[in-house]
Swiss-Prot record:
Function: Serine/threonine protein kinase component of the cell integrity pathway, a signal transduction pathway that plays a role in yeast cell morphogenesis and cell growth. Participates in cell wall construction, azole resistance, and host interaction. Required for the signaling for invasive filamentous growth and biofilm formation, and plays a crucial role in virulence.
Name of the featured protein: Mitogen-activated protein kinase MKC1
Gene name of the encoded protein: MKC1
Disruption of the gene: reported phenotype: Leads to thermosensitive growth, enhanced caffeine and caspofungin sensitivity, and alterations of cell surfaces. Also leads to a decreased pathogenicity in mice through displaying a greater susceptibility to nitric oxide (NO), a reduced inhibitory effect on macrophage NO production, and an increased capacity of macrophage stimulation by cell wall extracts.
Organism, scientific name: Candida albicans (strain SC5314 / ATCC MYA-2876)
Highest taxon of source: Eukaryota
């Protein structure tokens, strides 16, 4: 990295990082190169603006944490070169904004998009996000001793974030240790929404919804391996189960070398599925393959993890079931006895608004998607530069508007359904206006009791970790081969941890 005084370009400083232009707000100073790949660069930077600090993610106040004045800045290159990259970037930006503010979901500080100094074209985007010490993959790989309370805390926080995501009818689809960011206080946040998709209870509305499914193989649910077409929120629960097993054993539970081997590894541990389950969750070809295999008995988790808490193994078994209909839900998992030490209804909030994928998922033209991304960046930059009270007011209005639209849509569906069932009564006035809660999508339920919290967990030591959490963007634990799925670099892997950035650049143009 070039340490010379950076020249100014469009009000930003031009830095040399990995022999590429890295153009950032002049009030940030590059501290360290964190990682690079085919489609991006990540650096840590310090916010240098007198005594001011970057606002905290949850309340907009200056944070007192050690990293309060430090951020991770991610440059994504060639963003408009391919439709698939553009669509995933658009997905990521919209979802980061929608979930912004939840303590267990990554949240954005700021966005920036400027023309390339050499070509003058807009083909790069910069994401300013909170700097976290590492990700879960690095912690497990480091061999640091973790207590059972650490396991409980991490899984509980993952489930709190996932509960909020699922309540908005969103499936993450790529949960893995590398997409779980952790700091020295054992705070965990889910990142990387580039592969997320919407979910509907109506299977017909999910048609085509699993296209481009290229999530890391080791954490894929068996119904995906069996080419099942009716996917549910249970696919994310399976991934959480794989993460829990990796925490307990110190290594991934299902480490398939390829697509077929991954399915074989799952069946070796879970055993041959009943015929009724196989017919329900597998394609005809997949069913024939499983029937051709020798019948296998289910392995014992007590033997696989002899030192594990029995309650942890009970939760693991409920998460890792072949039949997605029998898999535990995120809400029931939060109430499991293994997590009762951490259970707090105030932390288990649900989203009050459903995320709208329809507004952009049907857009396929590269130019149109490019314009949508440019608009998203501009709107977000304007939003975060408003006073915190104005931000909250705008967010409240948007959520109320979206809730009203969704209410009307549900009423229309109900009316059409009743007209279909009772055509002679089409003129009947059956539309009823339900109550309208004036809540934001980060609403917190009223709880009378203050739940006691367990003693603070031991802090981590990060000196023996190889790199920052930002490196999860370019790492691939299960390197694919052939045409089975795209390299991790081509997935972009957006999403680091972040926080509210309301007064970051009030006078920045």
């Amino acid at each position: 990295m070039d340490q010379q005084e950076a020249p100014i370009y469009y009000g930003r400083s031009v830095n040399k990082v990995y022999n590429q232009e890295f153009i950032i707000d002049s009030r940030f100073k590059i501290v360290k190169e964190l990682g690079h790949g085919a489609y991006g660069i990540v650096c840590s930077a310090k916010y240098d603006n007198g005594s001011k600090k970057v606002p905290d993610s949850n309340n907009g106040n200056a944070s007192s944490s050690a990293n309060a004045s430090f951020v991770a800045i991610k440059k994504i290159t060639n963003i408009f070169s391919k439709n698939i990259l553009c669509k995933r970037a658009l997905r990521e930006l919209k979802l980061l904004q929608f979930f912004r503010g939840h303590k267990n979901i990554t949240c954005l500080y700021d966005l920036d998009i400027i023309p390339n100094p050499m070509t003058g074209e807009f083909n790069e985007i910069y994401l300013y996000e909170e700097l976290m010490e590492c990700d879960m993959h690095q912690i497990i790989r480091s061999g640091q001793p973790l207590s059972d309370q650490h396991y409980q805390s991490f899984i509980y926080q993952v489930l709190c974030g996932l509960n909020f995501i699922h309540s908005a009818d969103v499936l993450h689809r790529d949960l893995k240790p590398g997409n779980l960011l952790v700091n020295a206080d054992c705070e965990l946040k889910i990142c990387d929404f580039g592969l997320a998709r919407g979910f509907s209870e109506n299977p017909d509305e999910n048609a085509g919804f699993m296209t481009e499914y290229v999530a890391t193989r080791w954490y894929r649910a068996p119904e995906i391996m069996l080419s099942f077409t009716n996917y549910t929120k249970a696919i994310d629960i399976w991934s959480v189960g794989c993460i829990l097993a990796e925490l307990l054993g110190g290594k991934p539970l299902f480490r398939g070398k390829d697509y077929v081997d991954q399915l074989n590894q799952i069946l070796m541990i879970l055993g041959t599925p009943p015929e009724s389950t196989l017919q329900r969750i597998g394609s005809h070809r997949a069913q024939n393959y499983v029937r051709s295999l020798p019948i296998t008995r289910k392995a014992s988790y007590e033997e696989l993890f002899p030192d594990a808490n029995p309650l942890a193994l009970d939760l693991l078994e409920r998460m890792l079931t072949l039949d997605p209909r029998e898999r535990i839900t995120v809400r029931d998992a939060l109430n499991h006895k293994y997590l009762e030490l951490w259970h707090d209804p105030k932390e288990e909030i649900e989203c009050q608004v459903k995320f709208d994928f329809k507004s952009f998922e049907t857009v396929d033209g590269l130019d149109e998607m490019k314009q949508l991304i440019m608009d998203e960046v501009q709107k977000f930059r304007e939003f975060v530069r408003k006073p915190i009270e104005e931000q909250q007011r705008i967010q409240m209005q948007l959520h109320m508007q979206k809730r009203e639209e969704q209410r009307q849509e549900e009423e229309e569906k109900e009316l059409l359904e009743q007209q279909r069932q009772f055509p002679a009564q089409e003129s009947m006035d059956i539309s009823q206006t339900p109550y309208n809660n004036l809540e934001t999508n980060i609403g917190t339920p009223q709880v009378e009791d203050d739940y006691p919290r367990p003693q603070e967990l031991d802090e981590f030591t990060f000196s023996n970790l190889e790199s920052s959490s930002s490196m999860n963007l370019f790492q691939d634990m299960a390197k694919p081969s052939g045409e089975e799925y795209i390299k991790l670099e081509e997935e972009l892997g957006f999403g680091l941890d972040g926080a509210m950035f309301n007064n970051y650049c009030n006078d920045h143009q």
